[in-house]
Amino acid sequence: MKITIGHLYPDLLNLYGDRGNIQCLMRRCQWRGIEAETIPFELDDKIDFSKLDIVLLGGGSDREQMIVCEKLQKIQPDFKAYVEDNGVVIAICGGYQLLGKYYKTDQGNMKGLDLVDLYTEQGEGRLIQNIVLQSELFDMPIVGFENHGGRTCINNNKPLGKVLYGAGNDGKSGYEGVVYKNVIGTYLHGPLLPKNPQLADWLIQHALERKLSLIH
């Protein structure tokens, strides 16, 4: 059984070392004898979500996010169907913001992909610091570095974790990230997965479980 990881637009969404997250997933599969491959998608490439087991959506500048969002809007129904069918997604920083309904900035509103019921609005100043979370998903805390101007509201969705140290989604709710089905969105960098191998293993496990369920 092979795990196929789709890395969406690494040439544009490459602000925070997301290739380190890909390398972590590949290595942890290798250590367990799980065959894995990564497919990097450029802007003009066709994406067939039915052939992907894990999707990584990284972070970029507002300009690059807008370029990517306009492209993904054209295949939003396919991406939405993948998410609703328990497809595994890890979305970081700008990618996290793209999951939602919109991102409101001083320059105007950027329509999101509406994959998860959340939205982001630009706040005053940036939230920049180390951050520690306690998550119901893991015994070990989740650690990383946050650097974002957006304030994200996840409505009634489940957060990735409770903030023990740092700001989190909006600097006031006390929570960070979102978990919806097999989608995780977060502002944490580090890179995220090498710092939190338990999270990498969660993604791999859920990808394998989904693949097995589709076979049967």
Feature map (PLM): residue ranges:
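N-terminal beta1-alpha1 cap of cysteine-dependent amidohydrolase-like domains
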Residues: 1-84, 194-215
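Conserved beta-strand scaffold positions in the cores of enzyme catalytic domains, especially
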Residues: 7, 38-40, 115, 144-146, ...
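A secondary-structure boundary/capping signal
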Residues: 9, 92-94, 116, 148, ...
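Short coil/turn connectors at secondary-structure junctions
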Residues: 51-52, 85-87, 109-111, 139-142, ...
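Structural motif
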Residues: 54-58, 90, 185-187
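Cysteine-nucleophile active-site neighborhood
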Residues: 62-135
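Pocket-forming structural segment of enzyme catalytic cores
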Residues: 106-176
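C-terminal and late-domain segments of enzyme folds
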Residues: 141-142, 151-215
